From Swiss-Prot:
<keyword id="KW-0813">Transport</keyword>
<comment type="similarity">
    <text>Belongs to the complex I 20 kDa subunit family.</text>
</comment>
<keyword id="KW-0479">Metal-binding</keyword>
<feature type="compositionally biased region" description="Basic and acidic residues">
    <location>
        <begin position="191"/>
        <end position="213"/>
    </location>
</feature>
<feature type="binding site">
    <location>
        <position position="150"/>
    </location>
    <ligand>
        <name>[4Fe-4S] cluster</name>
    </ligand>
</feature>
<keyword id="KW-0004">4Fe-4S</keyword>
<dbReference type="Pfam" id="PF01058">
    <property type="entry name" value="Oxidored_q6"/>
</dbReference>
<keyword id="KW-0408">Iron</keyword>
<comment type="subunit">
    <text>NDH-1 is composed of 14 different subunits. Subunits NuoB, C, D, E, F, and G constitute the peripheral sector of the complex.</text>
</comment>
<dbReference type="GO" id="GO:0005506">
    <property type="term" value="F:iron ion binding"/>
</dbReference>
<feature type="region of interest" description="Disordered">
    <location>
        <begin position="183"/>
        <end position="213"/>
    </location>
</feature>
<dbReference type="GO" id="GO:0008137">
    <property type="term" value="F:NADH dehydrogenase (ubiquinone) activity"/>
</dbReference>
<keyword id="KW-0997">Cell inner membrane</keyword>
<dbReference type="GO" id="GO:0051539">
    <property type="term" value="F:4 iron, 4 sulfur cluster binding"/>
</dbReference>
<protein>
    <recommendedName>
        <fullName>NADH-quinone oxidoreductase subunit B</fullName>
        <ecNumber>7.1.1.-</ecNumber>
    </recommendedName>
</protein>
<comment type="function">
    <text>NDH-1 shuttles electrons from NADH, via FMN and iron-sulfur (Fe-S) centers, to quinones in the respiratory chain. The immediate electron acceptor for the enzyme in this species is believed to be ubiquinone. Couples the redox reaction to proton translocation (for every two electrons transferred, four hydrogen ions are translocated across the cytoplasmic membrane), and thus conserves the redox energy in a proton gradient.</text>
</comment>
<keyword id="KW-0874">Quinone</keyword>
Amino acid sequence: MRWSLTRADQTPAPKPGGQTYEEALRRNILFARLDDLVRWGRKNSIWPFNFGLSCCYVEMATAFTSRFDIARFGSEVIRASPRQADLMVISGTVFRKMAPVVKHLYDQLLEPKWIISMGSCANSGGMYDIYSVVQGVDKFLPVDVYVPGCPPRPEALLEGLMMLQESVGKEARPLSWVIGPQGIQKAPAPSRRDLKQAERNRATELHDPFSLD
């Protein structure tokens, strides 16, 4: 260990490597708005719930291995309880008997919470166009990111996670409490995603991704 003393009326001595103490201090202190720090921390610490429904879960579990290393994106903390998680990946076929269980688990997630629909079966029912399969998890849950494929590769899930992180990093944190003439009140902050869910469910035509419209 190396140390040195510098008088207050003297110029700080340069550290090994040519850096002064001011330069080293500038590299280790971050100045930002509180909202920016909250969004930065939130998007880089998404905790997924360890939950799977069908074969897509195999690809999801593979994304946590060292070969794909989902820990690079801050999502390596897999929680066994939905009360300790804020991300739920619907990976697999959602049967009608399983839908109430999925909804119950979603309600127990921590706020703010997000949903990734992984695979064709979760997105639209896949090839199971029958009475016993829900034709898309967005019929009863608000979905943030859709990952296509049957099944999607782990890289596709990581791409969906990066898209979710980008969206979370742009979310403005609403005011939680407002002081008014009636005292402290909680301001209503409805989710725009939830408000648009009914409109999106009624959509029958999608824009061509290669068009200029």
